[in-house]
Each structure stands twice: as C-alpha cells, then as structure tokens.
Amino acid sequence: MGNELFLAFTTSHLPLAEQKLARYKLRIVKPPKLPLEKKPNPDKDGPDYEPNLWMWVNPNIVYPPGKLEVSGRRKREDLTSTLPSSQPPQKEEDASCSEAAGVESLSQSSSKRSPPRKRFAFSPSTWELTEEEEAEDQEDSSSMALPSPHKRAPLQSRRLRQASSQAGRLWSRPPLNYFHLIALALRNSSPCGLNVQQIYSFTRKHFPFFRTAPEGWKNTVRHNLCFRDSFEKVPVSMQGGASTRPRSCLWKLTEEGHRRFAEEARALASTRLESIQQCMSQPDVMPFLFDL
C-alpha cells in the first residue's frame, strides 16, 4: 500500500511497457516510514509533528478558513471602495472646463482617425457593373451634391429619429419574388421608366427588410431585369450633345409584364394579403400599389 501511494500519478492509462517500468520502480524504491515521527512545534501554534514531502500544504502555516485571509481581503475592498469617495469634489468651473476640453479632444481625434465613409457598402460577391450601370452610378453621384456640414446634421438627426421609431421591430422578408418587387416599382412610377437605383430606392422604401439585408439582393434584381421578357430597356438619348456619353438606361414593363403582374397580384391578394401587409412600412397603400 505504501508503494502504491508513492506514485505521483496512476499508470492504468499508460502502455504496457510503461506500466511494467512503474511497477519495477515501486519494487526498488523504498517508501517513507509510517507513521511520521512527531516533533515538538517551535511556534506552538499547531500539532506537534513535522509534515513530510507528500503533503501539499503545511498545516502549521495555513490559516483557518474564513478568519484571517477573508478579513484581509475585505479590508482591501473597503479601502478601494472608499478611495473614490474620499477625493475632494471639483469646482463647477473646473468640471465644465474639463468637460469642454474632453469633448474637443474627442472630436479632433475622431475626425483624424475615422476615414470618410462610403454611402453604399457592397459585398465581395458583387457582380461587375456593365458600362451602362457604371455610367448610371456616376450620374447619380454627380447629380447629388454632398450637403454642407451645417445641413448634414438635420438630415442625420431625421434619419436617427426614423430608425429609432422602428428600432424595436424586426422586419421579415416579404413573400414576394423579385419579379413582383421590380414590377411594383415600375408600374407605380412615371411612364418613362426607372433606372436601377430608383428600383432599389422604391423597394427599400416600402419593404424595410431590404434596408438592412445583405447587398446580394441588388444583384438578383439586375439578373431578373436582364433575363426576363417582362421588362424592356429604354435607352435615353444624349443630353443636348453636351456630354460625350449617353445617360443610363431606364427600365419599363412590357405588355407581357403588365398581364402577368395583374394575374399574380390577384392570386397574392387572396392568399398572402395579411403577410404582405405585415412586411410593408405603409400597409394602407397596398391596394393602390397592387391595383386591387
């Protein structure tokens, strides 16, 4: 029994050769003598015996639990908790000056560190734009001038209020395919048609799910525009010959597209009316959009 206790760990999980080696060591190594020889304790604060090397702690120097160590920790915690309250309060003028200096330093550091943000962030899987779509994006960016700093603040505050009013609601995806979304935008717009960016804006306005959805849905809109016979591309002529490139193309519904949407809109109204209204930012306008 003494030899088995002399092992530092069990050997049952080891290979057979190592188990035999451990047993051999047990035979040649002499275990310590039991019982231990008692010796008088010079400090007289514990039992009169000297612990051997097998023991993890020395019972002569271990404090009783819940007495000395706990009280010391509590004293340190009390000291740390009283330190903030012991500081003298600052004057009102000093506090206001420090607040102003802190705000100025934060604004300067944020203006230096933060790079200018782009208006739209596309995912890595975005398709390459065609020449017409690139021209369309350039036209949109050139026609829309950036607001000045004193005009940008009211715009941002208005957007924040709109977002906060709908922050507690998670919008679900509307039970509509991309043909329905594109046809809704085209048939409820001007007769001359819409470009791709205007179709995006119409979809985000009436179906808030696409405001926070991944950017891949825009690629699917382009795909459906190019590969369906329900939509036609209407090129726009040059602007008075002043520019060297044509304007971006517009999209319109064909006769087949109007007929197909009218049939599918009646079917959707009879089966998914409530679920579609729950996904819309303005459910009351659904009869007008779908011409029900």
UniProtKB/Swiss-Prot annotation:
Keyword vocabulary terms for this entry: Activator, Cytoplasm, DNA-binding, Nucleus, Repressor, Transcription, Transcription regulation
Main location group: nucleus
DNA-binding stretch(es), residue numbering of this chain: 173-272
Result after altering M280L: Found in a patient with a severe neurological disorder; uncertain significance; reduced protein expression due to protein instability; protein misfolding; formation of nuclear puncta in some cells; loss of activation of HSPA1A, HSPA6 and DHRS2
Positions with biased composition (Basic residues): 149-161
InterPro entries in alphabetical order: Fork_head_dom (IPR001766), FOX_transcription_regulators (IPR052328), WH-like_DNA-bd_sf (IPR036388), WH_DNA-bd_sf (IPR036390)
UniProt entry tagged with the keyword Repressor: yes
Record region (Disordered): 31-50, 65-166
Protein origin, superkingdom: Eukaryota
Gene Ontology biological-process annotations: brain development; positive regulation of transcription by RNA polymerase II; regulation of transcription by RNA polymerase II
Polar residues: bias regions: 80-89
Compositionally skewed regions (Acidic residues) per UniProt: 129-140
GO cellular component: chromatin; cytoplasm; nucleus; perinuclear region of cytoplasm
Molecular function terms from GO: DNA-binding transcription activator activity, RNA polymerase II-specific; DNA-binding transcription factor activity, RNA polymerase II-specific; DNA-binding transcription repressor activity, RNA polymerase II-specific; sequence-specific double-stranded DNA binding
Pfam families for this protein: Forkhead
SUPFAM superfamilies: Winged helix' DNA-binding domain
Compartment list: Nucleus; Cytoplasm; Cytoplasm, Perinuclear region
Keyword Transcription among UniProt keywords: yes
PROSITE patterns associated with the record: FORK_HEAD_3
Pathological condition linked to this protein in its record: Defects in FOXR1 may be the cause of a severe neurological disorder characterized by postnatal microcephaly, progressive brain atrophy and global developmental delay.
Protein name: Forkhead box protein R1
Protein's organism: Homo sapiens (Human)
Gene: FOXR1
